[in-house]
Amino acid sequence: MSESIMDFRRAKFLISAPDIAHLNQYLPGDVGVEIAFAGRSNAGKSSALNALTEQKSLARTSKTPGRTQLINVFALDDDRRLVDLPGYGFAQVPLALKNKWQQALGEYLQKRACLSGVVVLMDIRHPLKDLDMQMIEWAVASEIPVLALLTKSDKLAQSAKMKTVNEVRSALADFGDWVKVEPFSSLKGTGKPKVLSILNEWCHPQWLMDAMAQESPED
């Protein structure tokens, strides 16, 4: 079966949940495909989601980092979902709340079998903080591919941007093919075709294609 092209503009809000337990209550089960978006609270995660789906308010943006406290789920179709995980690591968020978020993030990465890929968003000017590395390590340990997305790339000159991209790729080289690194700008659209190509690949894992082929009637 040939791989089709996913139209990410079709994304629509499905549900919000405070943690993975509540997520399991409302979703149709740990089935289909999910792609998670994770990042520090000032990494531009909501803006990236809105840019990739060409919807100005799919994910709510705020000038106050740490505003997104829930797991927000968006449906692409009956089988595929985008999951906006709580922002992590913002200093002004109370410690108890930060710990709650960290627990939810860890539970999701370790328990969600339908997770097909994780986008870890990092401000290109401040990449690979401790929590970013922890997210990447968690995902790879669970054999989940990662896209390390260096956001706000328009903030740097071309030479500085590529220097940072190459440095991050070098720092993550030990993870091999499990981790890809790409620059991205929600404002300028830089990197959008490449990111959508990776997400589309994650939306069509071989096991899902095989299952759909078995369900299709023979010609």
Curated annotation (Swiss-Prot):
GO terms for cellular component: cytosol. Mg(2+) binds at residues 46, 68. Keywords: Cell cycle, Cell division, GTP-binding, Magnesium, Metal-binding, Nucleotide-binding, Septation. One of its GO terms (biological process) is division septum assembly. It comes from the Bacteria. The keyword Cell cycle applies. The keyword Phosphoprotein does not apply. PROSITE patterns: G_ENGB. Residues 31-205 form the EngB-type G domain. Gene3D superfamilies: P-loop containing nucleotide triphosphate hydrolases. One of its GO terms (molecular function) is metal ion binding. InterPro entries: G_ENGB_dom (IPR030393), GTP-bd (IPR006073), GTP-bd_ribosome_bio_YsxC (IPR019987), P-loop_NTPase (IPR027417). GTP binds at residues 39-46, 66-70, 84-87, 151-154, 184-186. Its cofactor is Mg(2+). Belongs to the TRAFAC class TrmE-Era-EngA-EngB-Septin-like GTPase superfamily. EngB GTPase family. Necessary for normal cell division and for the maintenance of normal septation. This is Probable GTP-binding protein EngB.
